Amino acid sequence: DLNLNKVILFGHSLGGAISIELCGLCEEKIDRLILTEPNLDPATKGRTSWTVAQYTEENYKSRISSLIEYCASGKNTMWAATLRNWLPEAAYQISRDAIEVREVPWRDMFYSYKIPRFFIFGNKTLPSDDLEELPKNNIKVKIVENAGHSMAWENPEGLVQVICECLK
């Protein structure tokens, strides 16, 4: 035990789901939970995590390698850079978790926490039903202008500004 208290927990995309799970293990130590476009619901066909989850134990390393090459060819260089920094095992396992229908969904876990919670959108990913749904569950919604899902790449200064607003 590191004896940490008043931790500010941040997560993006699939990392948001990890942050939701971690918060469930130690909510009493968490001061606030800040998420940027996390996975709240199981990934569906057409999402990258769904595609990666379709790989098998036998071929996921070579398939992820092929996906990186495809993305690096100009299709999505940011995603290629991200995947290059992941262990293939981690990419495969979190993607498989992202498609599962959970006994307690990440969305329900996020709604249940009693700490301040924030959900940050990039304005280029809107509209979203969650823009109206999340505040009904006492979640503060913030928007980063001139950014989509990859807001830390697309507008890092804007993201910093919005995160600072969440810390006030």
Describe the role of every protein-language-model region:
Residues 20-24, 30-62:
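Flexible "cap/lid" loop of the alpha/beta hydrolase fold
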Residues 44, 50, 58-112:
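Conserved alpha/beta-hydrolase catalytic His-Asp/Glu region
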